[in-house]
Amino acid sequence: MAKRATRARPGRGRFITFEGGEGSGKSTQIQLLAERLKGQGIETLVTREPGGSPGAEIVRHLLLSGVGKLLGADAETLLFAAARDDHVHQVIEPALKKGVWVLCDRFTDSTAAYQGAAGKVDAAFIEALTHATIGDLEPDLTLILDVPVAVGLHRAIKRRGKAVADRFEQESLSFHESLRDAYRKIAADNPKRCAVVDANADAATVSERIWETMQHRLASALPARARA
């Protein structure tokens, strides 16, 4: 499989991923950022993982229903990789090539955190799968929304209402603590790509923190009026 460039080329869109544990506010913040970018005249696509393409959405249903857990951690990781392969080929890469900015709710760091650090799947196995499916594609910026585990789980319960908790919301408190630690380590190991955003605040405050990070990290790609 051909390697993909990790740095944005002239005319190519920017790839921004949102990461974080349950209830970190990713879904809200990704929409707020998309609206802000569109207001600056930047064509933007919001997508998610697992899912984002017809084939990947089928896999998403299987994964969140708990089927992956029945098959075991390694098999679950394979399902995530299969969904991501379809998503990247069908949605993400075509959009980036057209100059569209892609905002994705979860990407490879979720696999490293959920299946790797918290699920104990071998890191080398995950890395090999990643290179086999999507090559060297990496986000231009990864925003890791950080909240205390108790806060995040409370938000998730409130958001869910009477609906049944999904596969990952049902995990133990120690699992979610491991997730938070894993994301912090990912950020520390990849400081040029990742930015940790304190998301333990109201949505408007977190949105401003994200925009300030965008202005700092992707200033050259933003219109002049957006840098002020």
Swiss-Prot record:
PROSITE patterns the UniProt entry points to: THYMIDYLATE_KINASE
Broad EC category: transferase
Cross-referenced CDD domains: TMPK (cd01672)
Enzyme Commission identifier(s): 2.7.4.9
Coiled-coil ranges per UniProt: none
UniProt GO MF annotations: ATP binding; dTMP kinase activity
Gene Ontology biological process terms from the UniProt entry: dTDP biosynthetic process; dTTP biosynthetic process; dUDP biosynthetic process
Disulfide bonds listed in the record: none
Alphabetically ordered keywords of this record: ATP-binding, Kinase, Nucleotide biosynthesis, Nucleotide-binding, Transferase
Residues that bind ATP: 20-27
Recorded GO CC terms: cytosol
Catalyzed reaction equations: dTMP + ATP = dTDP + ADP
InterPro entries hit by this protein: P-loop_NTPase, Thymidylate_kin-like_dom, Thymidylate_kin_CS, Thymidylate_kinase
Family: Belongs to the thymidylate kinase family.
Function comment: Phosphorylation of dTMP to form dTDP in both de novo and salvage pathways of dTTP synthesis.
Protein name, entry field: Thymidylate kinase
Top-level taxonomy: Bacteria, Pseudomonadati, Pseudomonadota, Alphaproteobacteria, Hyphomicrobiales
